[in-house]
Amino acid sequence: MRFIIRTVMLIALVWIGLLLSGYGVLIGSKENAAGLGLQCTYLTARGTSTVQYLHTKSGFLEITDCPLLRKSNIVVDNG
């Protein structure tokens, strides 16, 4: 029982941290546009957000993989 309560409290603290900081955690990615685009999906405290990046295998022009964390445009507390 103690383990369940601690797990729920940890999840609540992480959610509050995401809500106040405005960051999202990567939950999925896929290539699109004939392999030139990369679509990354992030879980934020307010839902999910999708971002499009230019994608190359070499990383010469843009990114090769989605970043693990991403700052959202909408933040609850800018203080």
Swiss-Prot record:
According to the record, the signal peptide region is: 1-33
Q: Which is one Pfam family of this protein? A: YobH
Q: What is this protein called?
A: Uncharacterized protein YobH
Name the keywords, alphabetized. Signal
